[in-house]
């Protein structure tokens, strides 16, 4: 029987080296886990995008570069997090995540919008712009 690896490589690199490794940016999106959820998402001010994903998920791998681009483009306006659902099934269950990738938007620790599936970048940008727009 194979032993389960407790953390993804990007999570380990981020924990030990921060968002850069050897001067190279590892990720624009911050890994989040059950243990850091309340601090990183629940108590975050402003808009937070959480990408619920898994290593084995093909569509998740397709949307990952788009999520990274959005994290760069909206740096300072949007906090982008990534949650591995295999490593953190409790959080995925808490928010009823049944399909991945699911991109869930939070404000004040509460979900405010959701996008399911590997959708085009424009759909995600439209959702972000709408959520960042001042209330009319």
What are these regions (language model features)?
Residues 52-66:
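Conserved redox-active cysteine motifs that mediate thiol-disulfide chemistry
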Residues 5-26:
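Short, Lys/Arg-enriched N-terminal segments with co-localized hydrophobic residues
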Residues 83-92:
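Structural microenvironment flanking redox-active thiols in thiol-disulfide oxidoreductases
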Residues 99, 104-136:
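Non-catalytic, surface beta->alpha helical segment in thiol-disulfide oxidoreductase systems
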Residues 46, 52-56, 99:
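Short pre-active-site segment immediately N-terminal to redox-active cysteine/selenocysteine motifs
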Residues 29-48, 89:
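A short beta-strand-turn-helix
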Residues 45-47, 64-83:
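Conserved helix-turn-beta segment immediately C-terminal to the redox Cys motif
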């Amino acid at each position: 029987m194979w032993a389960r690896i407790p953390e993804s490589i990007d999570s380990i690199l981020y924990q030990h080296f921060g968002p850069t490794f050897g001067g190279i940016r590892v990720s624009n999106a911050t890994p989040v886990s059950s243990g850091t959820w309340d601090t990183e998402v629940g108590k975050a001010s402003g808009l937070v995008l959480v990408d619920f994903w898994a290593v084995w998920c093909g569509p998740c791998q397709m949307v990952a570069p788009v999520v990274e681009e959005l994290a760069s483009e909206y740096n300072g306006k949007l906090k982008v997090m990534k949650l591995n659902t295999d490593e953190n099934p409790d959080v995925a269950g808490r928010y009823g995540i049944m399909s991945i990738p699911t991109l869930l938007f939070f404000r004040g620790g509460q979900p405010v919008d959701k996008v399911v599936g590997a959708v085009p970048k424009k759909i995600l940008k439209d959702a972000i712009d709408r959520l960042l727009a001042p209330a009319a």
